[in-house]
Structures are given as C-alpha cells and as structure tokens.
Amino acid sequence: MALPLLEYKPT
C-alpha cells in the first residue's frame, strides 16, 4: 500500500 505520507506530514 503506497500512502502519500509526504502529503500527510505537517509542514
């Protein structure tokens, strides 16, 4: 499963 972790990361 490839989840967009970079998008979920709080910048």
From Swiss-Prot:
Keywords: Antenna complex, Membrane, Photosynthesis, Phycobilisome, Thylakoid. Transmembrane segments: none annotated. It is found in: Cellular thylakoid membrane. GO terms for biological process: photosynthesis. Its main location: membrane. GO terms for cellular component: phycobilisome; plasma membrane-derived thylakoid membrane. The phycobilisome is a hemidiscoidal structure that is composed of two distinct substructures: a core complex and a number of rods radiating from the core. This is Phycobilisome rod-core linker polypeptide CpcG3. It comes from Anabaena sp. (strain L31).
